[in-house]
């Protein structure tokens, strides 16, 4: 049976992280289910690589309307291996920490927590205020995995893509997919 991965893209800065994850997941035997918050397409106009939003959506096998709370991915009976919210806005963190499921991104994420399945959140906000930090702590205690979009420098990144690939590579590690899109730490002598 093919793995199903749910990807949520919010309107936070960091759209290239979500797009790159979709591109790399296509290389694996994975069924990609995508839902995006209402403002994600607007952020893509400013941060994207020039491709249309329609082209971004075409990277997924199934696209779910964020307003459709009756979508298959809104139910615990939908067998998803994991969900990644990338990037994850501060607003989405707050809604999740408060248990508010007012769109399909938040509903699907809360379902992952209640079903005890992996939920990976990639917050991109900086600086972090106390409210964001407390929300991340609350979600971490509830079982979510936090992957802040804080790239490493030990791998000597030369391009923006190197930094994007580092974060996406770490997400892939947590999903259990091997990828060589970033250099791993090999220690010192």
Show which residues each predicted segment covers.
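A cross-family phosphate/adenosyl-ligand binding-site feature
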Residues: 2-120, 124-189
């Amino acid at each position: 049976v093919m793995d199903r991965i749910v990807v949520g893209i919010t309107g936070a800065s960091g759209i290239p992280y979500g797009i790159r994850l979709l591109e790399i997941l296509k290389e694996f035997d994975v069924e990609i289910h995508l839902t995006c918050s209402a403002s994600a397409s607007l952020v893509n106009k400013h941060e994207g690589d020039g491709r249309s939003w329609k082209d971004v959506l075409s990277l997924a096998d199934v696209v779910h309307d964020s307003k459709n709370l009756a979508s298959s991915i809104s139910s615990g009976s939908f067998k998803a291996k994991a969900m990644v919210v990338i990037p994850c806005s501060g607003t989405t963190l707050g809604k999740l920490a408060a248990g508010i499921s007012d769109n399909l991104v938040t509903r699907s994420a809360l379902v992952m927590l209640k079903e005890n399945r992996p939920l990976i959140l990639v917050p991109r906000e900086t600086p972090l205020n106390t409210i964001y930090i407390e929300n991340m702590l609350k979600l971490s205690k509830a079982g979510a995995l936090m992957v802040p979009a804080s790239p490493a420098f030990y791998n000597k990144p030369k391009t923006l893509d190197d930094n994007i690939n580092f974060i996406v590579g770490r997400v892939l590690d947590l999903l259990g997919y091997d990828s060589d899109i970033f250099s791993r730490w090999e220690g010192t002598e």
